[in-house]
């Protein structure tokens, strides 16, 4: 089971679980929608994963813990005061039913992490469909290194970003496409996403294979090109 639960303006709280097992929640932006979904579908919550400290990824944790006082909450050091009970930065987490790989992915924030469960990557604000996160408390070199690390995952990896930014990202990617082949691929994806969003359907998840064809930040060959694109997107 893989479910993006809409939250706030454009966030997704991701739920992941195998059949008939408790589920994992990633980046609890708010409690209300998450707890309602869990109750409606009679789901048990096994753990919470936080990618970074920003309030739109952690704002629901404390309220959620009122309903699940013993729930383990994993996150990087920067989430220690946001409800995290277990601090992680790399390596593996073993819950009752899941083995979770912690992937360092700083840049958006200095200690940002992503989580790989089976072949699903929950990457917070590091990698978006057709885009990547802004650089705040991290730096450009760190972000480029993180994007490059994620790019090495298998093409079949399912990418689960925390925001519905796809359409605006595709508009940028089309404008900055390096050649007609890429521009055509981006345009086709934009048309597809426009249809989904018109029906109020999520554009996510995506796959690494698709992102390699449409995401300008995955196509950046060096740090200088990456910085150029990131600054251009900041002002687009």
Swiss-Prot record:
Q: Which family does it belong to?
A: Belongs to the metallo-beta-lactamase superfamily. Glyoxalase II family.
User: Gene3D superfamilies in the record, alphabetically?
Assistant: Ribonuclease Z/Hydroxyacylglutathione hydrolase-like
Give the gene name.
gloB
This protein's assembly is summarised as: Monomer.
Q: Which cofactor does it need?
A: Zn(2+)
> Which residues does the record give as Zn(2+) 1 binding sites?
52, 54, 108, 125
Name the catalysed reactions. an S-(2-hydroxyacyl)glutathione + H2O = a 2-hydroxy carboxylate + glutathione + H(+)
What Enzyme Commission number(s) appear in the record? 3.1.2.6
Per UniProt, the keywords (alphabetical) are:
Hydrolase, Metal-binding, Zinc
- Organism of derivation: Mannheimia succiniciproducens (strain KCTC 0769BP / MBEL55E)
**Role summary:** Thiolesterase that catalyzes the hydrolysis of S-D-lactoyl-glutathione to form glutathione and D-lactic acid.
Q: Which GO terms describe its biological process?
A: methylglyoxal catabolic process to D-lactate via S-lactoyl-glutathione
Provide any one GO MF term from the record.
metal ion binding
What pathway does the UniProt record associate with this protein?
Secondary metabolite metabolism; methylglyoxal degradation; (R)-lactate from methylglyoxal: step 2/2
Detail which positions bind Zn(2+) 2.
Answer: 56-57, 125, 163
What is this protein's name? Hydroxyacylglutathione hydrolase
Q: Does Zinc appear among the keywords?
A: yes
Could you tell me which InterPro entries the record lists for this protein?
Clx_II_MBL, Glyoxalase_II_hydrolase, HAGH_C, Hydroxyacylglutathione_Hdrlase, Metallo-B-lactamas, RibonucZ/Hydroxyglut_hydro
The record's comment on cofactor binding reads: Binds 2 Zn(2+) ions per subunit.
Instruction: Give the matching Pfam families.
Output: HAGH_C (PF16123), Lactamase_B (PF00753)
């Amino acid at each position: 089971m893989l479910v993006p639960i809409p939250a706030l303006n454009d966030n997704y709280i991701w739920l992941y679980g195998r059949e008939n097992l408790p589920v994992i929640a990633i980046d609890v932006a708010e409690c209300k929608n998450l707890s309602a979904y869990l109750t409606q579908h009679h789901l048990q919550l096994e753990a919470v994963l936080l990618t970074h400290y920003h309030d739109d990824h952690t704002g629901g944790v404390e309220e959620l813990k009122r309903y699940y006082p013993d729930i383990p909450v994993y996150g990087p050091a920067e989430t220690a005061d946001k409800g995290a009970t277990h601090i992680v930065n790399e390596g593996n987490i073993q819950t009752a039913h899941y083995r979770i790989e912690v992937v360092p992915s700083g840049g958006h924030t200095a200690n940002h992490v992503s989580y790989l469960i089976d072949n699903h990557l929950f990457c917070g604000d590091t990698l978006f469909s057709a885009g990547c996160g802004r650089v705040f408390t991290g730096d450009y070199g760190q972000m480029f290194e993180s994007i490059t690390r994620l790019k090495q995952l298998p093409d079949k990896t399912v990418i689960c970003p925390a925001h519905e930014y796809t359409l605006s990202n595709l508009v940028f990617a089309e404008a900055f496409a390096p050649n007609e082949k890429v521009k055509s691929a981006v345009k086709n994806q934009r048309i597809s996403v426009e249809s989904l969003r018109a029906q109020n359907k999520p554009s996510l998840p995506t796959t690494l294979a698709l992102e390699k064809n449409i995401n300008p930040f995955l196509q950046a060959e060096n740090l200088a090109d990456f910085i150029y694109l990131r600054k251009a997107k900041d002002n687009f």
